């Protein structure tokens, strides 16, 4: 571990300790006492942040490694060869094939299947509550029944 990393670790430990020394204030007391405690807590927190900025700026000193070594490390980086792109262009037949996910979809206009009924479906499943209300002789009318009568 380099000295720069050690300094950075020491600074982080110091910041962690500073934040632990400023817990959120307790709740008992009158409203003005609680307000003053929160105000003092916030002011201490701002002071800790200012100290953290100063500590961080101290650790941003120039790196100890020479510029030649940094350039050498950059030169060692390589980019992997990418595979050649496909040369054939898509044809119109490629767009007409149906994806396998869509093969099992049943159109909504199929009256024999009520399994696929969802929110967007035209068909309407009746719940047991609706059927019991009709049996009790309620005055509510189903708009779909009105459409089928005409």
From Swiss-Prot:
A motif (Nuclear export signal and binding to XPO1) lies at residues 69-80. InterPro entries: REV_protein. Residues 116-128, 137-150 have a biased composition (Basic and acidic residues). A motif (Nuclear localization signal and RNA-binding (RRE)) lies at residues 33-47. Residues 20-41, 103-150 are annotated as: Disordered. The keyword Signal does not apply. The keyword Membrane does not apply. GO terms for cellular component: host cell cytoplasm; host cell nucleolus. Keywords: AIDS, Host cytoplasm, Host nucleus, mRNA transport, RNA-binding, Transport. Its main location: host cell. It is found in: Host nucleus, Host nucleolus; Host cytoplasm. Residues 20-33 have a biased composition (Polar residues). One of its GO terms (molecular function) is DNA-binding transcription factor activity. Coiled coil: none annotated. Residues 14-22 are annotated as: Homomultimerization. It comes from the Viruses. It holds the Pfam family REV. GO terms for biological process: mRNA transport. The RNA-binding motif binds to the RRE, a stem-and-loop structure present in incompletely spliced viral pre-mRNAs. This region also contains the NLS which mediates nuclear localization. These overlapping functions prevent Rev bound to RRE from undesirable return to the nucleus. When Rev binds the RRE, the NLS becomes masked while the NES remains accessible. Homomultimer; when bound to the RRE. Multimeric assembly is essential for activity. Escorts unspliced or incompletely spliced viral pre-mRNAs (late transcripts) out of the nucleus of infected cells. These pre-mRNAs carry a recognition sequence called Rev responsive element (RRE) located in the env gene, that is not present in fully spliced viral mRNAs (early transcripts). This function is essential since most viral proteins are translated from unspliced or partially spliced pre-mRNAs which cannot exit the nucleus by the pathway used by fully processed cellular mRNAs. This is Protein Rev.
């Amino acid at each position: 571990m380099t000295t720069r990393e050690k300094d950075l670790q020491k600074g982080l430990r110091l910041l962690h300790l500073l934040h632990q020394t400023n817990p959120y204030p307790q709740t008992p007391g009158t409203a003005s006492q609680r307000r003053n405690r929160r105000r003092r807590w916030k002011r201490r927190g701002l002071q800790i942040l200012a100290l953290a900025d100063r500590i961080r700026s101290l650790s941003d000193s120039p790196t100890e490694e020479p510029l030649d070594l940094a350039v050498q490390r950059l030169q060692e980086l390589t980019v992997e060869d990418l595979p050649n792109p496909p040369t054939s262009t898509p044809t119109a037949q490629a767009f007409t094939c149906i994806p396998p996910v869509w093969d099992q979809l049943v159109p909504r206009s199929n009256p024999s299947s009520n399994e696929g009924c969802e929110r967007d479906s035209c068909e309407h499943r009746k719940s047991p509550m609706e059927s019991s209300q009709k049996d009790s002789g309620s005055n509510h009318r189903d708009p779909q029944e009105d459409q089928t009568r005409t």
